Amino acid sequence: MLTTRRVRFYGRVQGINFRSNTLVKALELGVKGWIKNLPDGSVEALFSGESEQIEKLISYCVSNMPYAEVKRYDVYIEPYTEFQDFQIKR
């Protein structure tokens, strides 16, 4: 089922290639959308695609991301949005 999720990651998630590692994994899983650093030190992402693949991507970000220490993450259901690719926003 196609779905879109907005996710905020908190903890040690900036300055450790979190966004670029997420981009690589998203491309591997066929997830589209974007990811960006926020001024408060968190990272926000919008993941769009098959719900199972999005869950795998979130799990990777939370549990298997090199050097990251995700203390908390919030997931929000969004209206489905179609993207052409996955981007790192600056």
Curated annotation (Swiss-Prot):
Source domain of life: Archaea
Molecular function terms, GO-annotated: acylphosphatase activity
Active site: R19, N37
Keywords: Hydrolase
A Pfam family per the record: Acylphosphatase
Acylphosphatase-like domain location: 4-90
Enzyme Commission number(s) of this protein: 3.6.1.7
InterPro entries the record matches: Acylphosphatase, Acylphosphatase-like_dom, Acylphosphatase-like_dom_sf
Catalytic activity: an acyl phosphate + H2O = a carboxylate + phosphate + H(+)
Alphabetical list of SUPFAM superfamilies matching this protein: Acylphosphatase/BLUF domain-like
Family (UniProt): Belongs to the acylphosphatase family.
Protein name as it appears in the record: Acylphosphatase
UniProt organism field: Thermoplasma volcanium (strain ATCC 51530 / DSM 4299 / JCM 9571 / NBRC 15438 / GSS1)
